Amino acid sequence: MKVVAVLGSPRPQGGSSTLARRVLDGARAAGHEVVVYEISKMNVRGCQACRTCKDNLVDCVQEDDLQPYWKDLHECGALVVSACNYCSMVNGPMITYMNRHYCLIGGDNRVRVHPGIKLVGVFSQGNPDPNRIAHVYDWFLRDFQNRDMVLVDKLVHSARWPQEQIDALLERAYQIGLNL
């Protein structure tokens, strides 16, 4: 199975990236093919509301660094999305990425990606309470669930946790990847 990961943190060694990469380690150990996109290193434009996707039932036609992603998304069995938290919100580049999935709902309101893609959300925040802004993460993930993806798990990390709590979360992340 192909596992596509979209990492949203501008810090490759940051909490959300580290945790997401641990999920991917588990996926690789299970024999899955892994494709990684790092949004902070990509030229990704926001949706321009051109409606080409709706009128022609095609993936987004914008010529930016997301072009290869659409093919990978249609081929994958799992999608891992990770984001850091800025000011109690998913970081901006990941919201832009999320909005681009507008193209996956046709003009007839049918989802244009195969149903059942497994979805894993990985988030990092400064607040030690993982439930403090869970509603924000749920809002973000719901956009993917509205495209018939199935949420497998949601991981929330805080750098303020003791190391043993972080280690347990890293092990949980690995197991999630292993069991995709």
Where do the PLM segments sit?
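Short glycine-rich anion-binding loops that position phosphate/pyrophosphate groups of nucleotides
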Residues: 85-87, 126-127
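Short, glycine-/small-residue-rich phosphate/pyrophosphate-handling segment
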Residues: 92-93, 109-152
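N-terminal beta1-alpha1-beta2 submodule of the flavodoxin-like/Rossmannoid cofactor-binding fold
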Residues: 1-82, 88-104, 151-152, 160-180
